[in-house]
Amino acid sequence: MKRQLGIALLGALLLSVGCNPIKRLSDTEWDHYRALRVYMSEDERNAFLKNKTEEERNEFLQALGLWDRFYQYPEDVRELILSGDVARGWTKDKLLMAWGRPYDMQKLAGRDTYRSERYIYRFEEHEDGRLIIWTKGSKTAYKAIRIFERTVILDDDVVAEIKG
């Protein structure tokens, strides 16, 4: 019985090696990859995923200068970023790590700040209540019960308003 279990586990391990490289990531790695991929080009994302060990992947992020962007925050703030609970007062960096690049963005004039921007994000709402950030070419949008937008106003790189 133990031998069969060992063989089954070995088989599952061998099958997983050839699978999607994202599935190889530990929960912690997936968390920082998900937050930091917004700052990586497609080539950098692929290079990150090609690294064989967690140590190599972590060193890769450090070499790109991205590691501290996420780990500068205390654990409770990192958890808020990962859960997507964007709130007024958040920095632009935290917003981008939580929701990624916006669907659309515009410079705003006439506000009492040095720099003001409007970021528009699209979301998919699914039957089970999940919200997924919509991206161009989404493969899940057809399952959504609705697609809606949220507008975020950034004043001097700080979230000032969230509408929608």
List each model region and its residues.
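Intrinsically disordered, low-complexity segments enriched in polar/charged small residues
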Residues: 8-9, 155
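Bacterial N-terminal signal peptides that target proteins for export
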Residues: 1-8
